[in-house]
From Swiss-Prot:
A UniProt-annotated Pfam family: EGF_CA
Organism: Homo sapiens (Human)
Source species, domain of life: Eukaryota
Chain ranges of the EGF-like domain: 26-71, 173-213, 214-253, 254-293, 294-333, 334-378
Name listed for the protein in its UniProt record: EGF-containing fibulin-like extracellular matrix protein 1
Disulfide bonds: 177-190, 184-199, 201-212, 218-228, 224-237, 239-252, 258-268, 264-277, 279-292, 298-309, 305-318, 320-332, 338-350, 344-359, 365-377
Gene3D superfamilies, A to Z: Laminin
Entry function: Binds EGFR, the EGF receptor, inducing EGFR autophosphorylation and the activation of downstream signaling pathways. May play a role in cell adhesion and migration. May function as a negative regulator of chondrocyte differentiation. In the olfactory epithelium, it may regulate glial cell migration, differentiation and the ability of glial cells to support neuronal neurite outgrowth.
Main location class: secreted
Anything else known: Up-regulated in malignant gliomas. May increase glioma cell adhesiveness and invasive properties.
Consequence of changing residue 345 to W: In DHRD; misfolded, accumulates in cells due to inefficient secretion; induces the formation of deposits between Bruch's membrane and the retinal pigment epithelium where it accumulates
SUPFAM superfamilies, alphabetized: EGF/Laminin, Growth factor receptor domain
Gene Ontology molecular function: any one: growth factor activity
Length: 493
């Protein structure tokens, strides 16, 4: 400002000595300055004092010639003056005030510079630039006084450094960034300021020495939810398999694979970061853990069905042989054909056995036996042939399963008529040639037929069980036969 004031005063002196020149009067100042009627010169406006909340976001306001700066609170400003300190005598007509111009290099320690600037240290102010915290501002300020604008636009004016005269004879800011007159490095960004410029590192970089180096954002948590990938001047977030970035490009959210691209053949269950496949009953996961294969239940167990297991897709079923029906899905139950349908004649009776039925004559008596109302075959005493034959024969039928466990009581014989002073004995008269049976007397009038060898069917056994009755005084002797037909079924059920 002193330099501009000195030139102005010199111009006024020349004007006063030349009577032919038109007297120049000043009516206004450039932007950022106001007229001081006392000192008769333009003075800087301290916007930091008069503008409410001039800087936002925690920035500090630093008054600047013709304007102000909003810088981080940690920023420092070193003023670079291109002229050493000078003192000039006031010209005629001025207030006589002296404005000092102080070179930054003349400051030995930190302190406040004229115009509101700051100096860091003697070593730092030796050069024309400084760094201001992480934002990397390099600021050059030229605190020369702005020139007052003459009311006569035909006269040329002197502008402060960083300004130039416009076609309207006002001092306007020089955009050093556009003009290419800045001294920012190739890896820095030039930012134009009023009357000056600043050099700043691009986003994602920080100043280290004279260079802009990449900021590794991945070392400053928590930038990313899961994975952080640093790139020159930036970074990006990645998610683990099974997750995807949310709209904020930071948070990882689970991918519901069951909704997006269901790869499961049957059932899909989403879990955090993945999914699992399950199969319906009767199927199992294949080796790829996606598809389902039928389980051959019949191969895995031989106890599923009582008779035969039939594998089907996803299930199995049980079958029974002819003469049986499936009950409770797995067991076989004999069908009583005598209660449903049979082919027996009128003179035959139907006898059901395990797995089938047979027709037997309703009158099984053979000559010389005759049928009584009690369904007994009796040999008449009057018939001479009956003297050597059993007095009566009773026909009975029973059915047993194949391979029945032994020993097993299967049939009980008992006298229907009891005579006084008689003794009854029991024996197997015929049909036990292979020793499959044993007759055990259980009382004076009864005996139990015992199966002692397992029988396999289908087959039929006819066993004659005889009861001998003898008088205790030997007056008479008689016998009765129970002809038992044993039908062995084809299966053990």
């Amino acid at each position: 400002m002193l330099k501009a004031l000195f030139l102005t005063m010199l111009t006024l002196a020349l004007v006063k000595s030349q009577d032919t020149e038109e007297t120049i009067t000043y009516t206004q100042c450039t932007d950022g300055y106001e007229w001081d009627p006392v000192r008769q010169q333009c003075k800087d406006i301290d916007e930091c004092d008069i503008v409410p909340d001039a800087c936002k976001g925690g920035m500090k306001c630093v008054n600047h010639y013709g304007g102000y700066l909003c810088l981080p609170k940690t920023a420092q400003i070193i003023v670079n003056n291109e002229q050493p300190q000078q003192e000039t005598q006031p010209a005629e007509g001025t207030s006589g005030a002296t404005t000092g111009v102080v070179a930054a290099s003349s400051m030995a320690t930190s302190g406040v510079l004229p115009g509101g600037g700051f100096v860091a240290s003697a070593a730092a102010v030796a050069g024309p630039e400084m760094q201001t915290g992480r934002n990397n501002f390099v600021i050059r300020r030229n605190p020369a006084d702005p020139q007052r604008i003459p009311s006569n636009p035909s006269h040329r004016i002197q502008c402060a450094a960083g300004y130039e005269q416009s076609e309207h004879n006002v001092c306007q800011d020089i955009d050093e960034c556009t003009a290419g007159t800045h001294n920012c490095r190739a890896d820095q960004v030039c930012i134009n300021l009023r009357g000056s410029f600043a050099c700043q590192c691009p986003p994602g970089y920080q100043k280290r020495g004279e260079q802009c180096v990449d900021i590794d954002e991945c070392t400053i948590p928590p930038y990313c939810h899961q994975r952080c990938v640093n790139t020159p001047g930036s970074f990006y977030c990645q998610c683990s398999p099974g997750f995807q970035l949310a709209a904020n490009n930071y948070t990882c959210v689970d991918i519901n694979e069951c909704d997006a691209s269901n790869q499961c053949a049957q059932q899909c269950y989403n879990i955090l970061g993945s999914f699992i496949c399950q199969c319906n009953q009767g199927y199992e996961l294949s080796s790829d853990r996606l598809n389902c294969e039928d389980i051959d239940e019949c191969r895995t167990s031989s106890y599923l069905c009582q008779y035969q297991c039939v594998n089907e897709p996803g299930k199995f079923s049980c079958m029974c042989p002819q003469g049986y029906q499936v009950v409770r899905s797995r067991t076989c139950q004999d069908i009583n054909e005598c209660e449903t349908t049979n082919e027996c004649r009128e003179d035959e009776m139907c006898w059901n056995y395990h797995g089938g039925f047979r027709c037997y004559p309703r009158n099984p008596c053979q000559d010389p036996y005759i049928l009584t109302p009690e369904n007994r075959c009796v040999c008449p005493v009057s018939n001479a042939m009956c003297r050597e034959l059993p007095q009566s024969i009773v026909y009975k039928y029973m059915s047993i399963r194949s391979d029945r466990s032994v020993p097993s009581d299967i049939f009980q014989i008992q006298a229907t008529t009891i005579y006084a002073n008689t003794i009854n004995t029991f024996r197997i008269k015929s049909g036990n040639e292979n020793g499959e049976f044993y007759l055990r007397q259980t009382s004076p009038v009864s005996a139990m037929l015992v199966l002692v060898k397992s029988l396999s069917g289908p087959r039929e056994h006819i066993v004659d069980l005889e009861m001998l009755t003898v008088s205790s005084i030997g007056t008479f002797r008689t016998s009765s036969v129970l002809r038992l037909t044993i039908i062995v079924g084809p299966f053990s059920f």
